[in-house]
Protein backbone atom coordinates (compact mmCIF):
# COMPACT_ATOMS: atom_id res chain seq x y z
CA UNK A 1 0.00 0.00 0.00
CA UNK A 2 1.09 3.58 -0.66
CA UNK A 3 1.71 6.06 2.14
CA UNK A 4 -1.12 8.20 0.70
CA UNK A 5 -3.59 5.37 1.25
CA UNK A 6 -2.66 5.01 4.93
CA UNK A 7 -3.22 8.74 5.46
CA UNK A 8 -6.58 8.51 3.71
CA UNK A 9 -7.48 5.43 5.74
CA UNK A 10 -6.66 6.95 9.15
CA UNK A 11 -8.62 10.09 8.27
CA UNK A 12 -11.71 8.05 7.38
CA UNK A 13 -12.01 5.70 10.34
CA UNK A 14 -15.54 6.05 11.72
CA UNK A 15 -15.56 8.20 14.86
CA UNK A 16 -11.87 9.12 14.64
CA UNK A 17 -11.62 12.80 15.58
CA UNK A 18 -8.59 15.06 15.26
CA UNK A 19 -8.15 14.87 19.05
CA UNK A 20 -7.98 11.05 18.92
CA UNK A 21 -5.58 11.15 15.97
CA UNK A 22 -3.34 13.48 17.97
CA UNK A 23 -3.23 10.88 20.78
CA UNK A 24 -2.38 8.13 18.29
CA UNK A 25 0.35 10.20 16.63
CA UNK A 26 1.90 10.83 20.05
CA UNK A 27 2.67 7.07 20.07
CA UNK A 28 2.90 6.14 16.37
CA UNK A 29 4.98 8.01 13.80
CA UNK A 30 2.88 7.17 10.74
CA UNK A 31 -0.64 6.05 9.81
CA UNK A 32 0.90 2.82 8.51
CA UNK A 33 2.16 2.05 12.04
CA UNK A 34 -1.38 2.59 13.36
CA UNK A 35 -2.75 0.31 10.63
CA UNK A 36 -0.32 -2.46 11.56
CA UNK A 37 -0.44 -1.99 15.36
CA UNK A 38 -1.48 -4.83 17.63
CA UNK A 39 -4.47 -4.52 19.96
CA UNK A 40 -2.12 -4.39 22.93
CA UNK A 41 -0.19 -1.46 21.46
CA UNK A 42 -3.41 0.40 20.60
CA UNK A 43 -4.71 -0.19 24.14
CA UNK A 44 -1.60 1.55 25.52
CA UNK A 45 -2.58 4.88 23.90
CA UNK A 46 -4.05 7.36 26.40
CA UNK A 47 -7.74 8.20 25.92
CA UNK A 48 -8.25 5.67 23.11
CA UNK A 49 -11.27 3.57 24.07
CA UNK A 50 -12.12 0.01 23.14
CA UNK A 51 -14.75 1.35 20.70
CA UNK A 52 -11.98 3.31 18.92
CA UNK A 53 -9.83 0.18 18.69
CA UNK A 54 -12.78 -1.75 17.28
CA UNK A 55 -13.34 1.01 14.69
CA UNK A 56 -9.66 0.80 13.68
CA UNK A 57 -9.87 -2.99 13.35
CA UNK A 58 -13.12 -2.86 11.36
CA UNK A 59 -11.74 -0.24 8.99
CA UNK A 60 -8.79 -2.52 8.16
CA UNK A 61 -11.10 -5.22 6.80
CA UNK A 62 -13.63 -2.96 5.12
CA UNK A 63 -12.80 -2.28 1.48
CA UNK A 64 -15.26 0.66 1.45
CA UNK A 65 -12.46 3.06 2.44
CA UNK A 66 -10.24 1.67 -0.32
CA UNK A 67 -13.05 2.09 -2.87
CA UNK A 68 -13.57 5.69 -1.71
CA UNK A 69 -9.83 6.29 -2.04
CA UNK A 70 -9.93 5.05 -5.64
CA UNK A 71 -13.05 7.11 -6.40
CA UNK A 72 -11.62 10.44 -5.27
CA UNK A 73 -8.65 9.99 -7.59
CA UNK A 74 -11.05 9.48 -10.52
CA UNK A 75 -12.89 12.70 -9.55
CA UNK A 76 -9.67 14.71 -9.58
CA UNK A 77 -9.77 15.20 -5.81
CA UNK A 78 -6.32 15.17 -4.25
CA UNK A 79 -5.12 15.51 -0.71
CA UNK A 80 -2.06 16.49 1.25
CA UNK A 81 -0.91 15.93 4.82
CA UNK A 82 1.86 17.14 7.17
CA UNK A 83 5.29 16.36 5.78
CA UNK A 84 4.21 16.71 2.15
CA UNK A 85 5.86 19.52 0.22
CA UNK A 86 2.49 21.11 -0.67
CA UNK A 87 0.98 20.99 2.86
CA UNK A 88 0.66 24.63 4.03
CA UNK A 89 3.24 24.88 6.83
CA UNK A 90 1.42 27.83 8.42
CA UNK A 91 -1.39 25.45 9.40
CA UNK A 92 1.00 23.57 11.67
CA UNK A 93 1.05 26.64 13.93
CA UNK A 94 -2.58 26.18 14.95
CA UNK A 95 -3.46 23.81 17.78
CA UNK A 96 -5.99 21.65 15.95
CA UNK A 97 -4.57 21.66 12.42
CA UNK A 98 -6.15 19.26 9.92
CA UNK A 99 -4.21 16.06 9.29
CA UNK A 100 -5.50 15.98 5.74
CA UNK A 101 -6.56 18.71 3.31
CA UNK A 102 -8.57 17.65 0.28
CA UNK A 103 -8.41 19.89 -2.74
CA UNK A 104 -9.08 20.33 -6.44
CA UNK A 105 -6.90 22.53 -8.58
CA UNK A 106 -3.85 23.72 -6.73
CA UNK A 107 -3.09 24.93 -3.24
CA UNK A 108 -1.79 28.46 -2.63
CA UNK A 109 1.85 29.16 -3.43
CA UNK A 110 3.49 29.52 -0.01
CA UNK A 111 6.14 31.84 -1.47
CA UNK A 112 3.51 34.41 -2.48
CA UNK A 113 1.52 36.66 -0.14
CA UNK A 114 -2.10 35.80 0.59
CA UNK A 115 -5.01 37.73 2.01
CA UNK A 116 -8.14 36.31 3.63
CA UNK A 117 -11.41 38.14 3.02
CA UNK A 118 -14.43 36.97 4.99
CA UNK A 119 -17.61 38.69 6.06
CA UNK A 120 -21.35 38.60 6.45
CA UNK A 121 -23.54 36.44 4.25
CA UNK A 122 -26.39 38.89 4.59
CA UNK A 123 -24.54 42.05 3.59
CA UNK A 124 -25.51 45.34 2.00
CA UNK A 125 -25.04 45.99 -1.71
CA UNK A 126 -22.36 48.50 -0.77
CA UNK A 127 -20.52 45.86 1.29
CA UNK A 128 -20.70 43.41 -1.61
CA UNK A 129 -19.35 46.05 -4.01
CA UNK A 130 -16.43 46.93 -1.69
CA UNK A 131 -15.56 43.24 -1.16
CA UNK A 132 -15.46 42.70 -4.93
CA UNK A 133 -13.34 45.85 -5.29
CA UNK A 134 -10.87 44.56 -2.66
CA UNK A 135 -10.73 41.15 -4.36
CA UNK A 136 -9.97 42.77 -7.73
CA UNK A 137 -7.33 45.11 -6.30
CA UNK A 138 -5.58 42.46 -4.21
CA UNK A 139 -5.46 40.13 -7.22
CA UNK A 140 -4.04 42.98 -9.29
CA UNK A 141 -1.26 43.37 -6.71
CA UNK A 142 -0.42 39.67 -6.99
CA UNK A 143 -1.99 38.59 -3.69
CA UNK A 144 -3.76 35.23 -3.45
CA UNK A 145 -7.33 35.73 -2.20
CA UNK A 146 -8.60 33.10 0.24
CA UNK A 147 -12.17 32.96 1.52
CA UNK A 148 -15.05 30.61 2.25
CA UNK A 149 -17.35 30.76 -0.82
CA UNK A 150 -20.34 31.75 1.35
CA UNK A 151 -22.96 34.10 -0.04
CA UNK A 152 -22.26 37.77 0.48
CA UNK A 153 -18.80 39.15 1.21
CA UNK A 154 -16.85 35.89 0.65
CA UNK A 155 -18.26 35.23 -2.82
CA UNK A 156 -17.99 38.89 -3.86
CA UNK A 157 -14.28 39.04 -2.96
CA UNK A 158 -13.57 35.85 -4.88
CA UNK A 159 -15.52 37.01 -7.92
CA UNK A 160 -13.44 40.19 -7.88
CA UNK A 161 -10.17 38.25 -7.75
CA UNK A 162 -11.23 35.97 -10.62
CA UNK A 163 -12.49 38.93 -12.68
CA UNK A 164 -8.99 40.44 -12.46
CA UNK A 165 -7.29 37.14 -13.41
CA UNK A 166 -6.06 36.46 -9.90
CA UNK A 167 -5.77 33.32 -7.81
CA UNK A 168 -8.61 32.65 -5.39
CA UNK A 169 -9.18 29.67 -3.15
CA UNK A 170 -12.26 28.67 -1.16
CA UNK A 171 -11.89 26.84 2.14
CA UNK A 172 -15.02 24.70 2.41
CA UNK A 173 -16.75 23.27 5.45
CA UNK A 174 -18.21 20.49 3.30
CA UNK A 175 -16.58 18.11 0.85
CA UNK A 176 -14.85 19.47 -2.24
CA UNK A 177 -17.35 17.61 -4.41
CA UNK A 178 -20.26 19.61 -2.93
CA UNK A 179 -21.20 23.13 -4.02
CA UNK A 180 -22.74 24.93 -1.05
CA UNK A 181 -24.61 27.17 -1.39
CA UNK A 182 -25.92 25.89 -4.75
CA UNK A 183 -26.48 29.46 -5.92
CA UNK A 184 -22.68 29.80 -6.13
CA UNK A 185 -22.29 27.00 -8.70
CA UNK A 186 -20.74 29.34 -11.29
CA UNK A 187 -18.19 30.59 -8.75
CA UNK A 188 -17.58 27.01 -7.58
CA UNK A 189 -16.61 25.88 -11.06
CA UNK A 190 -14.19 28.81 -11.46
CA UNK A 191 -12.44 28.42 -8.14
CA UNK A 192 -9.65 26.30 -6.91
CA UNK A 193 -10.92 24.85 -3.69
CA UNK A 194 -9.80 23.02 -0.58
CA UNK A 195 -11.55 21.30 2.29
CA UNK A 196 -10.87 19.21 5.38
CA UNK A 197 -13.32 16.58 4.09
CA UNK A 198 -13.52 14.77 0.74
CA UNK A 199 -17.32 14.40 0.83
Stretches with model-predicted labels:
Residues 1-83:
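Short, small/acidic-rich helices and loops at N termini and domain boundaries
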Residues 1, 81-195, 199:
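Glycine-biased, small-residue-rich flexible motifs in mid-sequence functional cores and linkers
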Amino acid sequence: MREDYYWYWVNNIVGMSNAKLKKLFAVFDTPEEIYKASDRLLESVNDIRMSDIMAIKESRKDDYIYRQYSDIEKQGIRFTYPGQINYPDKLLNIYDYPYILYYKGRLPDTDKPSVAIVGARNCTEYGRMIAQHFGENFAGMGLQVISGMALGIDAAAQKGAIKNGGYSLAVLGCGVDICYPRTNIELYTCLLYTSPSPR
